[in-house]
Amino acid sequence: MTRDIDRENYAELYGPTTGDKVRLGDTELFAKVEEDLRTHGDEAVFGGGKTLRDGLGMAPGVTQAEGALDWVLTNATIIDPILGIVAADIGIRNGEIAGIGKAGNPDTMDGVDMVVGPSTDVYPAEGKIATAGGLDIHIHFNSAQLHEHALSGGITTMLGGGYGGGATTCTTGPENVKRFLQAAEAWPVNVGFYGKGNASDPGPLREQVEAGVCGLKLHEDWGSTPETINTCLEVAEDEDVQVCMHTDTLNEAGFLENTFGAVDGRTMHLFHIEGAGGGHAPDIMEMVGEPNMLPSSTNPSMPYTDNTFDEHLDMVMVCHHLNPDVPEDVAFAESRVRAETIAAEDVLHDMGAISMMTSDSQAMGRIAEVIPRTWQTASKMKSQRGPLPEDEGTGADNHRIKRYIAKYTVNPAISAGIEEHVGTLEPGKLADICLWDPAFFGVKPAMTFKGGFPVHSEMGEANGSLMTCEPILQRERAGAVGKAKHAISLSFVSPAAAEAGIDEEYGLDSRVVPIEGARTPGKDDMVYNSYCPDDIEVDPETFEVRVDGEHVTCEPSSELPLAQRYLL
């Protein structure tokens, strides 16, 4: 027996299907489902009178050891830079994504490729958007509570360093690296720490790599000279770790051309490429045209608004220990904050020329705002620039959506050498998954799975009669406590440190995983964000940015989506 139902009714019951569109929060962005991997009429649904019962959608004779899923997220709308925008069930086994497709009982349902058994738990994802957990790979680990805010904002992987004067994203020296890896045992997230890359002698750099850093960070506050840049890159090439750089704002040791010569074509992740966060003034942004440079933005300058310029001056003064009574310190701050390059930054993101978004947490940026700032920028660019050429005539924004979600998922993973484990919902990767109510997409995840287990979600009062009793807040789930947090989290370290067995030496319970291939990515590998302008110039007097001769700019916004409707 078959029954026909209209699209609206189907979407209410099982979520959208092929051709349906979903608005992302209160943005101007609409995602259109490109493919539905479920079998219509045989949907997997949990609850009283629903299909996932013994002998119906649940196969009673299949154990976990025989292949039954540990978890199934039913009828999700997936937004992923690699998989696309699809409707499907998501299967989880042993902490990893087991499959994207149709889950259920193959004896009673058609098209089943993932078995639901008595050992399978269910998260009803009908009407929810599923994305890979976000990555923030520019974190100042100043606060031990950062992970709480990261999870509340959809971030499940945190790479960076601390303390470095609180300003430099460096964990300096082997003893401090050891202590941070031990401290991270308390956090139910994936972590990795950058060592100080500023040394003209390779010895101190190698000892940090051997101690367990996942990369090296060059920062102007420690002296980003051509000599330290070259030495750092030589060590990184030998040890297969990434180098992240904050260049010389004051141009004391050389200009952009000198830094470019010191890099000499080797791969490097350039932080806050626009320059307000630091870097050769005023032309660091010209590096987005280099094929070996992997550029990222930090979220305080994204998107450009009426308040951006004024806010940055105060933040620079505080972050870099500058004195407002010293004219040279004020001049330093003012040289970094340029409305013209900030305005160009939004457009370069929309063109796919800037590949990644990060926070610069507690050193001008906000860790919980990586994802909302990304989508605010995407929505602003649609409003000001119109549909991308690839989206013309589709009635949706799929290409733009994939471009922007890649900025905080797959591209940071590729840059850091950890894409084998995180960054997409492809089978075989760690099951770090955020589920979003479409109305709250990009701001407040409804549920976050970490390593295949619930770690954080919207949750009511624990003494309430139901989970929905107010106040509903972002709260820890079982995966965040006890020994579970070790089982669901990875600590990313250098290949040398993993081979040396630092997990046993340091007494670590979380899984220690070596990064791999951090020296090979180029701009061409940045998914949906690989555009390398042939010619990009920053005018040294007006700071206007020109790409292939055309002035690139946008208007500041006075109002944004995903803002005061959602957050006090």
UniProtKB/Swiss-Prot annotation:
Ligand binding (Ni(2+) 1): 138, 140, 217, 360
Listed Pfam families: Amidohydro_1, Urease_alpha
Enzyme kind, highest EC tier: hydrolase
Source organism of this protein record: Haloarcula marismortui (strain ATCC 43049 / DSM 3752 / JCM 8966 / VKM B-1809)
Annotated InterPro entries: Amidohydro-rel, Metal-dep_hydrolase_composite, Metal_Hydrolase, Urease_alpha_N_dom, Urease_alpha_subunit, Urease_AS, Urease_asu, Urease_asu_c
Quaternary structure and interacting proteins, as annotated: Heterotrimer of UreA (gamma), UreB (beta) and UreC (alpha) subunits. Three heterotrimers associate to form the active enzyme.
Alphabetical list of PANTHER family matching this protein: UREASE
Keywords: Cytoplasm, Hydrolase, Metal-binding, Nickel, Plasmid
Residues that coordinate or bind substrate: 219
Domain of life: Archaea
HAMAP family, A to Z: Urease_alpha
Cellular component, GO annotation: cytoplasm
Family listed: Belongs to the metallo-dependent hydrolases superfamily. Urease alpha subunit family.
EC number: 3.5.1.5
Start and end residues of each Urease domain: 133-568
Active-site residues from the entry: 320
Cellular location(s): Cytoplasm
Catalytic activity reported: urea + 2 H2O + H(+) = hydrogencarbonate + 2 NH4(+)
Protein's name in the database: Urease subunit alpha
Cofactor requirement: Ni cation
Keyword Cytoplasm carried by entry: yes
Biological processes annotated in GO: urea catabolic process
Binding residue positions for Ni(2+) 2: 217, 246, 272
UniProt GO molecular function: nickel cation binding; urease activity
Sites bearing N6-carboxylysine, chain numbering: 217
Pathway(s): Nitrogen metabolism; urea degradation; CO(2) and NH(3) from urea (urease route): step 1/1
